[in-house]
Swiss-Prot record:
GO terms for molecular function: magnesium ion binding; xylose isomerase activity. Keywords: Carbohydrate metabolism, Cytoplasm, Isomerase, Magnesium, Metal-binding, Xylose metabolism. The gene is xylA. This is Xylose isomerase. Homotetramer. The lineage of its organism: Bacteria, Pseudomonadati, Pseudomonadota, Gammaproteobacteria, Enterobacterales. Mg(2+) 1 binds at residues 232, 268, 296, 339. It comes from Serratia proteamaculans (strain 568).
Amino acid sequence: MQSYFDQLEQVHYEGPTSNNPLAFHHYNPDELVLGKRMAEHLRFAACYWHTFCWNGADMFGVGSFDRPWQQPGDALTLAKRKADVAFEFFHKLNVPYYCFHDVDVSPEGASLKEYLHNFAVMTDVLEEKQHSSGVKLLWGTANCFTHPRYGAGAATNPDPEVFSWAATQVFTAMNATQRLGGENYVLWGGREGYETLLNTDLRQEREQIGRFMQMVVEHKHKTGFQGTLLIEPKPQEPTKHQYDYDVATVYGFLKQFGLEKEIKVNIEANHATLAGHSFHHEIATAIALGIFGSVDANRGDPQLGWDTDQFPISVEENALVMFEILKAGGFTTGGLNFDAKVRRQSTDKYDLFYGHIGAMDTMALALKVAAKMVTDGQLHQQVSKRYAGWNGELGQQILQGKLSLEALAQYAEGHALAPQHVSGRQEQLENLMNRYLFG
């Protein structure tokens, strides 16, 4: 097989003093952090779609990249060539996992029959590639949003035949994910929303997608899939409003359909930005609700109202995220997937490496800062002190349901309560955070 990235053997850790742009400066996979290898903490994955499927096009311009597998030709032959390049990239980047949508790896074809045939062929190819390279599948998913049939959604479509086509894709992608040893299966409702309420029945669409998710859970248990099911929240784009708006919205949906113990969330940083939240907020909310699963590590531009999918470069932002994850015990089946793409002007094929190397170094630095925060314990102590009253007799009686509203009012009056405001010490804690970051 002819090498595509023929000027590079493999990316390795060379340390912070190295001037080699094709080396890791902070990500040392074997370095121990809190007693665990850095690679095991971070569980990096590269994505198939932005890295190998995007051609550099945007709403105002055609594709700017010269990718041999994106040229005219036999679709399956080109898909196999793309797989060759993808796994060469995964190996040379030294990344342990990858992620895909069904039509990232396989031509959709002109019919459902062709789709099923092509995906079966490419599942065989991926299985062989994983075996020979040692690269594993973090998660698979089905693209039920790009084709025109999904213009009005997939599970929320007004036509049950479109719903059925989407069900076939998810059924097939779940089976492929299980066969390939995928540790999770993701459901992103790219067009599960609306553009106008003038032609939308909200109750009907909610019932449809609720039943769809129940079917997915039923299939998981029927087949014995051991991975985690994940929903990926996003507030809008491409629709005006999406039903999986943010983590809290997804939790409400899961509770409505009795799925809160079955499905967790895959949180993307850029989607948090679009929802008006910090990345930190969405991670902390998911952990608090018991539905944290995995992360799409990227960044958005707060000055732009769309999904820019840039590589993460903020150690400060991601240290807070990794702090929450470490406090919660770390990843189980999830990991850090780089749902990020090089810029349209980044036309050198090695720009793919520069983007991922910088992101991996950023997350490694963030992990080390988060580990200092955990070990030092000052933030934990400050928060514990702030809520200490809830561990006392009054707080415990309230939480345990031993006091009614009337009884509590009588207690407050009888004890002549006159609580005094206590400083939240935000500025002090922000200064402490800077010391963790910069020494």
